[in-house]
Amino acid sequence: KIIDELLQFVNERQWWIFSFEWNTFEEKYWLKIKPCFVRFRYLDNNLNSGFLWTKIDDISLIIDDFKNLDIKCNKVFIIENEINYLTFPKIKDSIVIWWKWFNISNLKNIDWLKKLEIYYWWDIDSHWFKILAQCRKYYSQTKSILMDMETYSYYKQYIVKWKIITDREFKNLTDYLDKKEYSLLEYLNKNNLRLEQENIDHEYVGKTSI
């Protein structure tokens, strides 16, 4: 805030800059914005064509470079927790993306993702069902995994309190969640509950993932 005030003072002749509402400090002063990175792993060694004469399993790319890829896979798993990302089981013709950001809109408009099976796994709570709905706006084929009442009930000892989403937000989700997902969302939101995905053990993941 102090730097912002100083820059406004220095640039007082350019008063029109400050008459707009800017999303970020960088946009306001035409500064370079820190790029968004996508981190992903190959779940099938046959997909890894190699980089600099060696095969690299865990890769991070800026979003624009990721958009230009053409990985010959059939399935993509999107996961929020890093440990689960690192320990996710090997699956034929698949990659897994670690997406720790709340804003999943940064993953939209990636042409090669549009033709693939996409599986979404986040915490079982109202917020992440909202993000699932948003993901389906961009990729309607997206399916949720390990975000069902069976998983929730199996790990009931790890259920904790959580914040709710508003009625207005609820109305915007009906077109993007199936009946079971929406029913679980209503239950979670009514009771202010959540189950974090890091509480789900690796053996259970291996048995139930695609």
Predicted regions and their residues:
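Nucleic-acid enzyme cleavage-core boundary/entry regions
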Residues: 1-117, 127, 134-137, 141-145, ...
